[in-house]
Swiss-Prot record:
Name by which UniProt lists this protein: Olfactory receptor 1500
Gene (UniProt): Olr1500
Family indicated by similarity: Belongs to the G-protein coupled receptor 1 family.
Pfam families reported for this sequence: 7tm_4
GO CC annotation: plasma membrane
Topology in membrane: Multi-pass membrane protein
Amino acid sequence: MTGNNQTLILEFLLLGLPIPSEYHLLFYALFLAMYLTIILGNLLIIVLVRLDSHLHMPMYLFLSNLSFSDLCFSSVTMPKLLQNMQSQVPSISYTGCLTQLYFFMVFGDMESFLLVVMAYDRYVAICFPLRYTTIMSTKFCASLVLLLWMLTMTHALLHTLLIARLSFCEKNVILHFFCDISALLKLSCSDIYVNELMIYILGGLIIIIPFLLIVMSYVRIFFSILKFPSIQDIYKVFSTCGSHLSVVTLFYGTIFGIYLCPSGNNSTVKEIAMAMMYTVVTPMLNPFIYSLRNRDMKRALIRVICTKKISL
């Protein structure tokens, strides 16, 4: 349907990844293996935290929510990517595109918020150990997680509604493997000033401020451990915080890389590669980082396996 030189767009074409045809099958198998690893790894953490009573602590409540967020974050984009890699016409409906955008932002925002909360949890545990159980009570932590989900849903809904009000002309080709908000803005023939303004303002609240809060938490932790009497205590703190710092580096490093690295003619390829890092690679590595460097997780896995063997 046309009018005023505009076309009602019913679907978009996702060009996906610039993969040569001879490597298409290889990359399909690679992405499928990565997605299955994401599902199994993050489900394992969720199940362990649920089944093992020794992990019923704030730190692991946040970790299980992070694993759930990682699992859903990848599931928003990966199934459609795999489907389109096997399709002659890699399309997504207009409604499906907005739905994908909404949930992508929900789970992406949630990961950013949870990393802040986990940093705060470590800060309280190390700097105020005697008051830890009082400050990080079960009720407080559950309420905090619920609040974070509400904030992320509200933020994602705002951007989705702002995109929904835009008009899209004849161009419907998205140079990405999912409905990225920046790619959609490039296709719009409407005034996108409000959209860009909200991205800059709220982007700082969702990305910059959480990152600064994490840095502040670890600065306080660093100065606190300088007062520790023994090397063993310092090593224990570093081993406890090391997993979280690794995840923070992976997540924020790739996101900042999109905006801080100089853009050239291959800026679209760079954005796609970076997006693949924080939507696929990071969620895949997180379970390994937390399980391989965490004694509690290893012991919980052994206890659950032994319990199942005894019950059989």
